[in-house]
């Protein structure tokens, strides 16, 4: 691999190709695909399209996959023990603390915690975090894949490079291009902060690098170097749109390498939403495409917590999105463009990367499939044309960008895929994280809501909490603590170990019926530094 390619796309470690590129089940709640996929209870009345039924191949004898686990058991019940639960919850957790200089942290970010809990096998969510080295700021993002993990994997590897390049001044772009031309080593533009299980595709790194290079060459040609001001919002939008365009173009052109040729097609025909935050001092930008969310945790003067939404879901619950779609297509399609709260009756998010089945013309789809590998040509999903498909594209990857200037009371930011937001209210998310970060969790009164609780039940709740007073400290990661509550909370808002154990014991075919993949990043802000910015004005 050429040196410049290696510098831009570091190889974390060799990965299991079967885990990354093996046959993926094209089954996800984002697509109305089959009855065994995860579909929220309120949407179960919708009938799947027959063409999707062939993509769900539940493993036979699922019980065999549990034989390696040890269970605490009763004659009829099998529960994971608390240590086993912790092992599952903490398997994918990652924490990063911003390094100090001379004993001081001069960044507006103290650090972040992240974690993932799969429901699909393999998990279709991805996450990324990186520090921009040639400019200022940090990038953090969550990516929710559907119809497989190929697109979310590619976007998680590539999007931050496109954003970083979009933020670079003209002279830096020229320096990078000259270094590549002359074969000289160049400084990396990103410092990645990744869990050991997060990976880069070494097979596709050269292809990805060449597409990125073409992008910065075009930026050099477009920019004469006269203007030094870079609009972060515009850079984010351009990066999202350009990456999606490259994903589409790579699939159309193909690759002489059969492995890469199949890979780029899988990336293009699957899809992914993205929610990305760029933090530079007190300037916070959130770019969102799809239905993942960014939530700001604000601590009020009385110590209470409030949630400030920094992103909008791009789905049928968003009236502006519905109006946008209807305006982009003829009036004759007003009743068909969104059916049963889904794009063309099939796709839940109205914005996403990939998903070329909702972007390409029918002729282009047929031409690419017919000239593609046998695995693609034999796949009923790729050959299926959505109903009422008259005026593509119906889908865009253009993000909606929100700006927020940080204040001392802004304590943290939660980025999470919809697997979290479908199980917890935003205010509960912020309260749980806030109490965790301030160590106040065990001091809060037990909330029983409108339930009638007997004295014996209350005694049981108090006893349970007393034995678990250290639970807040048994989780050293805020994202892990949040997942524990998202999966294990009972009607009283406390973690029920029996419920948590049951949910984590479900085989993958059942897990998807109860919840989605969950990916969370919790970013903690440095109130002292943020306050200093404010005082300088």
From Swiss-Prot:
Q: Which GO terms describe its biological process?
A: peptidyl-threonine dephosphorylation; signal transduction
An annotated GO cellular component of this protein is: pyruvate dehydrogenase (lipoamide) phosphatase complex
Q: How is its activity regulated?
A: Magnesium-dependent and calcium-stimulated. PDP1 activity strongly depends on its Ca(2+)-dependent binding to the lipoyl domain of E2 subunit of component of the pyruvate dehydrogenase complex.
What are the N6-acetyllysine sites (modified residues) in this protein?
A: 202
Q: Which residues bind Mn(2+) 2?
A: 144, 418, 516
Transit peptide location: 1-71
GO MF entry, a single one: [pyruvate dehydrogenase (acetyl-transferring)]-phosphatase activity
Q: What is its EC number?
A: 3.1.3.43
Q: What's in the keyword line of the UniProt record? A: Acetylation, Calcium, Disease variant, Hydrolase, Magnesium, Manganese, Metal-binding, Mitochondrion, Protein phosphatase, Transit peptide
Q: Its catalytic activity?
A: O-phospho-L-seryl-[pyruvate dehydrogenase E1 alpha subunit] + H2O = L-seryl-[pyruvate dehydrogenase E1 alpha subunit] + phosphate
For binding Mn(2+) 1, which residues are annotated in this chain's numbering? 144-145
Q: How is the cofactor bound?
A: Binds 2 Mn2(+) per subunit. Binds 2 Mg(2+) ions per subunit. Mn(2+) can substitute Mg2(+) for catalytic activity.
Ranges of residues in domain PPM-type phosphatase: 109-525
Where, subcellularly, is it found? Mitochondrion
Q: Which CDD domains match?
A: PP2Cc (cd00143)
Matching entries from SUPFAM superfamilies are given as: PP2C-like
Which cofactors does the annotated protein need, by name? Answer: Mn(2+); Mg(2+)
**PANTHER family attached here?**
[PYRUVATE DEHYDROGENASE [ACETYL-TRANSFERRING]]-PHOSPHATASE 1, MITOCHONDRIAL, PROTEIN PHOSPHATASE 2C
* Family designation: Belongs to the PP2C family.
Annotated disorder:
Pyruvate dehydrogenase phosphatase deficiency: Results in lactic acidosis leading to neurological dysfunction.
Give the protein's function.
Mitochondrial enzyme that catalyzes the dephosphorylation and concomitant reactivation of the alpha subunit of the E1 component of the pyruvate dehydrogenase complex (PDC), thereby stimulating the conversion of pyruvate into acetyl-CoA.
Oligomeric state and interaction partners are given as:
Heterodimer of a catalytic (PDP1) and a regulatory (PDPR) subunit.
What is this protein's record name?
A: [Pyruvate dehydrogenase [acetyl-transferring]]-phosphatase 1, mitochondrial
Please state the gene responsible for encoding this protein: PDP1
């Amino acid at each position: 691999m050429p040196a410049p390619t290696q510098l831009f796309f570091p190889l974390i470690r060799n990965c299991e190709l079967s885990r990354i590129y093996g046959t993926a089940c094209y089954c996800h709640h984002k697509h109305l695909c089959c009855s065994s996929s995860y579909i929220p209870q309120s949407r179960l009345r919708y009938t799947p399209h027959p063409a999707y039924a062939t993509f769900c191949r539940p493993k036979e004898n699922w019980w065999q996959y549990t034989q390696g686990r040890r269970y605490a058991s009763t004659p009829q019940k099998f529960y994971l023990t608390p240590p086993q639960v912790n092992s599952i919850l903490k398997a994918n957790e990652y924490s990063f603390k911003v390094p100090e200089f001379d004993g001081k942290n001069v960044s507006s970010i103290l650090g972040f915690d992240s974690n993932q809990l799969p429901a699909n096998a393999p998990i279709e969510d991805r996450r990324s975090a990186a520090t921009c080295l040639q400019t200022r700021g940090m990038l953090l993002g969550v990516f929710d894949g559907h119809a497989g993990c190929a697109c979310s994997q590619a976007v998680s590897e590539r999007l931050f490079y496109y954003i970083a390049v979009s933020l670079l001044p003209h002279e830096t772009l020229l320096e990078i291009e000259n270094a590549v031309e002359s074969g000289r080593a160049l400084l990396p533009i990103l410092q990645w902060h990744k869990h050991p299980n997060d990976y880069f595709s070494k097979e596709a790194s050269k292809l990805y690098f060449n597409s990125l290079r073409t992008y910065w060459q075009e930026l050099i040609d477009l920019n004469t170097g006269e203007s030094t001001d870079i609009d972060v919002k515009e850079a984010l939008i351009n990066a999202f749109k350009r990456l999606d365009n490259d994903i589409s173009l790579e699939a159309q052109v193909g690759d002489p390498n059969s492995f890469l040729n199949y890979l780029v097609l899988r990336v293009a025909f699957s899809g992914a939403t993205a929610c990305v935050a760029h933090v530079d001092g007190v300037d916070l930008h959130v770019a969102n495409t799809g239905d993942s969310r960014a939530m700001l945790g604000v601590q009020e003067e009385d110590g209470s917590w409030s949630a400030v939404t920094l992103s909008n879901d791009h789905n049928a619950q968003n009236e502006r999105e519905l109006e946008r779609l209807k305006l982009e297509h003829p009036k004759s399609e007003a009743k068909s463009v969104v059916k049963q709260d889904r794009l063309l009756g099939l796709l839940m998010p109205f914005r996403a990367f990939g998903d070329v089945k909702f972007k390409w013309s029918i002729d282009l789809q047929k031409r690419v499939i017919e000239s593609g590998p046998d695995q693609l040509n034999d796949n009923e999903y790729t050959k299926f044309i959505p109903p009422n498909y008259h005026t593509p594209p119906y889908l865009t990857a253009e993000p909606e960008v929100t700006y927020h200037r940080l204040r001392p009371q802004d304590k943290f930011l939660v980025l999470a895929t919809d697997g979290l937001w479908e199980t917890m209210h935003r205010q509960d998310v912020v309260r749980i994280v806030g109490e965790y970060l301030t160590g106040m969790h065990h001091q809060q009164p037990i909330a029983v809501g409108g339930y009638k609780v007997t004295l014996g039940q209350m005694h049981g709740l108090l006893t349970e909490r007393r034995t678990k007073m250290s639970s807040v400290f048994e989780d050293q990661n805020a994202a892990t603590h949040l997942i524990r509550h998202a999966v294990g909370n009972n009607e009283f808002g406390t973690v029920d170990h029996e419920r948590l154990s049951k949910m984590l014991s479900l085989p993958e075919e059942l897990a998807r019926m109860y919840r989605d993949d969950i990916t969370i990043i919790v970013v903690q802000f440095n109130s002292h530094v943020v306050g200093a910015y404010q005082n300088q004005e």
